[in-house]
Amino acid sequence: PPPPPFFFHPYAGIRDAQESRGLGDVYKRQALVMLILLLAFFAVSQLKKFENLVFLLVIVVYSAINIYFYIYHGLVFSLSYPLVACFLSMITINLYLFMLERKQKTFIRGAFSQYLSPAVIDMIVKDPDKLKLGGERREMTAFFSDIQGFSTVSESLTPEELVQLLNEYLTSMCEVISSYNGTVDKFEGDAIIAFWGAPLDNPDHARDGCMAALDMQERNIELRKKLREENRPMLYTRMGINSGPIVVGNMGSATKTDYTMMGDNVNLAARLEGANKFYKTYTMIAENTYKLAEDSIDVRYLDVVRVVGKNEPVKIYQLLAKKNQLAGSMQEVLEHYEKGMNCYKNLKFKDAIMNFENALKLEPEDGPCLTYVNRCKMYLDQPPPKDWDGVFNFTEKG
């Protein structure tokens, strides 16, 4: 028989209280779910990792299944423990990835801090995918420099004085290279080897290399004033620059590697640095570099040469100044020089000498003019062959 009426209402009250408490627990769980979801969204927005999206998807699907069973079947599953466990797993994985990324950034800063500008390092740290440590072929500009007569300079100084002078010089030069986002490859005694266009792409690599070379020569002028006042030896730097396809990357043994470059275009830059002595110049660039940077620089055409180790002739230029910034009487010197070069190419060596000497009246120490006066005199005594192509063959590296 049904329970007496006076028993029904207490039973109904107990049942209503239980259902109300159950619904309250559900609401608490739903609030917890929302909190977890908000935290998950925050993690995704901050870390932007694919793994976080997977965790978020798991949380959403699990919550949707629970809501479905509660609405249509009256079943309530525990949301708190699985979702908290899922979220803790996500935090653990992200902490691991964070530590891994931090280790990678520390490696990048340690590996490149000595020869990359801080701005370039920051770019690589923000996007390590831009850095390829394996060998790759890039369009780049290679730079070589060497101090003229450094052996004589070193013999006049004590070891301590020599190291102090060299450190002062190298620091000043490398500051300029870094300011133009160049990469210092290595030092070989007093020589500096650097490049532009790696590890990050730089469409203006030739221009930046030329601008850096010009500023480095300006720094040398300032340094020589200081050295003269301190009664220390003067330093004059020869530089060679060439652009083109170059192989660059981490090279070496299994235990010791360097981020460096190699290739024919690198070798040509080294040859041009040494070739300065034949023209009594200090900064020489190849035709490839000139074509890429001609809108930003003033140059003097020097010669068509065949350097040691290369069969193809190369046009070479003296890098003089930034565009429209020629100093003193150089513009007038160049006018006489160009007339002399036209005579030289047409085998009119006497007329060529006259024009070169007119230039020397303005700049008595002009290296290329002195070089061509001597060469024209040589050809007057020993004329070139009838099939002469105008190419001058170097018989030594310089």
What residue ranges belong to the model's regions?
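Short, small-residue-biased leader/transition segments that mark boundaries at the very start
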Residues: 2, 11-27
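Transmembrane alpha-helices and their extracellular/periplasmic helix-loop junctions
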Residues: 25-115
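Membrane-proximal helical linkers
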Residues: 102-134
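Catalytic NTP-binding/metal-coordinating core of nucleotidyl cyclase/transferase enzymes
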Residues: 130-215, 256-259
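Alpha-helical scaffold within the catalytic cores of cyclic-nucleotide enzymes
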Residues: 166-182, 198-239, 243, 264-277, ...
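Cytosolic regulatory/linker segments at or just downstream of nucleotide-handling modules
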Residues: 246-248, 277-346, 357-358, 363-368, ...
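Intrinsically disordered, low-complexity, charge-biased linker/tail regions
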Residues: 385-398
